[in-house]
Regions:
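Conserved active-site tyrosine of GNAT-family acetyltransferases
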Residues: 39, 134-140
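Conserved GNAT acetyl-CoA-binding A-motif
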Residues: 115-128
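Conserved catalytic-core motifs of GNAT/GCN5-like acyltransferases
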Residues: 126, 141-163
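Short beta-strand micro-motifs in enzyme catalytic cores
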Residues: 62-66, 87-90, 156-160
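Conserved acetyl-CoA-binding loop-helix of GNAT-fold acetyltransferases
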Residues: 94, 100-113, 125
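Conserved beta-strand in the GNAT
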Residues: 67, 73-81, 86-93
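Short amphipathic alpha-helix that is part of the acyltransferase structural core
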Residues: 2-54, 60, 67-70, 166, ...
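A short beta-turn/loop motif at secondary-structure boundaries
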Residues: 55-61, 150-153
Length: 205
């Protein structure tokens, strides 16, 4: 399968080729429901994670969700949270029939691209010990040195880390104000507020 990563275009209803994986930022309630459905299948169904541990209060607290689709079907999801000097990779989830490389790799690549564009130089994750070698093979994500394994939700975890290189046009405090206002991941194209800037200021109450 070949991965098609698309953070700048909304999902198109036209069916994609079977082998294509398309990753987009979740922008609608329907997108988020798809991510929640996938996570429910994998974490609650397969790993028997309790509901209140899987849905931990962080899904609406400044998080960005990515959705992977093959054609019109959601097949994977991932959550990103943003801290002062690092991004946090969470809830990487792939449907059982789509595991094997292309879908998780597409989600990871999209997460790295998005975090780097936001100016982050490090992305950290909490990875189940059994999955750490797979993450290293797929995306060169390494285990943090000097950090002890830890346990939550019945699994043993390690901290993993990947260094990122922000692009020259990464978002900074000095970026154009209208660029900063654009939808997440769509900073290179005019948004609705760009269009509104063509109207003269009337300063209505």
């Amino acid at each position: 399968m070949t991965a098609k990563i698309n953070l700048t275009e909304p999902y198109q209803a036209v069916p994609l080729p079977k082998e294509a994986v398309c990753v987009t930022v979740a922008r609608t309630l329907d997108d988020l429901v798809q991510a929640i459905a996938i996570r429910s299948v994998v974490y609650m169904g397969e790993q028997l994670c309790p509901y209140d541990e899987e849905f931990d209060g962080n899904d609406f607290a400044g998080a960005t969700h990515l959705i992977a689709r093959i054609g019109s079907q959601p097949v994977g999801a991932l959550r990103l949270r943003w801290f002062c000097d690092f991004a946090k990779l969470e809830r990487l989830t792939v449907m059982p029939h789509c595991r094997g490389g292309a879908v998780p790799r597409a989600l990871l690549d999209a997460a790295f691209e998005l975090a780097a564009k936001k100016g982050y130089r490090r992305i950290m994750g909490h990875t189940q010990v059994r999955l750490a070698p797979t993450l290293k093979r797929l995306a060169k994500v390494g285990v943090r040195e000097g950090r002890a394994p830890f346990v939550f939700s019945d699994h043993e975890y390690v901290e993993t880390i990947k260094e990122l290189t922000p692009p020259d046009d990464a978002i900074t405090i000095d970026s154009d104000p209208l660029v900063v206002l654009r939808p997440e991941g769509q900073w290179d194209r005019p948004g609705v507020l760009d269009r509104s800037a063509a109207r003269p200021a009337t300063n209505p109450c």
